[in-house]
Amino acid sequence: GSEMCIRDRNIVIAIIFISVIGTLLHFMYEWSGHNKVVSLFAAVNESTWEHIKIALTPTFIWTLYDGAVYGLNPNYFEAKALSILVIIVLIPLLFYAYQLITKKAILPIDITIFYLTIIISNLVFYYIINMESLHFFYTYISVIVLFIIFGSYMVLTLLPIKNFLFKDPITKRYGIRGHSHHEHKEK
């Protein structure tokens, strides 16, 4: 019926919105003249974490829309939490899996992984939204997971963990210090 048509349209719009905003966020920190506020939401270096972040930012923004449309759905928080976890897990999983074979990063593959992850994330969201109502326990856990993810997302740019996910492969640094403009300034 018409409800399914609206949902089909919403999934396509979600994928396009998240993909376009995510792509722009790859360059936004540079374009903003290295604005600290922009650094919280945009990629500040070429690390895997920053590529996860630029998929999460538009997903969080899209939550303002899908929360209004689907927020009363009993599976909304489960759908949101799992769709976000798909992004957090799938980007590094696919990125490091193909590099085991190629031994190096290949830009067209990286870009494909980014968009493919956004598509899969949204398919997971819409699949769970359309399932039979899940137990309230899962809603409770999902809300906690969402708070943890959002809190971590806000903190990790400013205080990156010193591991491979956060290390810029070019500058070998972390967080904002991993941005290539720091290389030129520090003499």
Residue positions per predicted region:
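Alpha-helical transmembrane segments of multi-pass membrane proteins
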Residues: 19-33
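Short, small-residue-biased leader/transition segments that mark boundaries at the very start
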Residues: 1-6
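Small-polar-interrupted transmembrane alpha-helices in polytopic inner-membrane proteins
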Residues: 22, 26, 62-63, 79-96
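Membrane-interface helix caps and helix-loop-helix hairpins in membrane proteins
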Residues: 73-74, 97-108, 130-135
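Alpha-helical transmembrane segments of multi-pass membrane proteins, especially transporters
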Residues: 14, 79-87, 110, 114, ...
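Alpha-helical transmembrane segments and their helix-start/interface "positive-inside/aromatic belt" motifs
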Residues: 7-16, 138-145
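Short aromatic-rich membrane-water interface segments that cap or initiate transmembrane helices
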Residues: 40-53
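C-terminal, well-folded lobe of enzymatic/effector domains
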Residues: 108-187
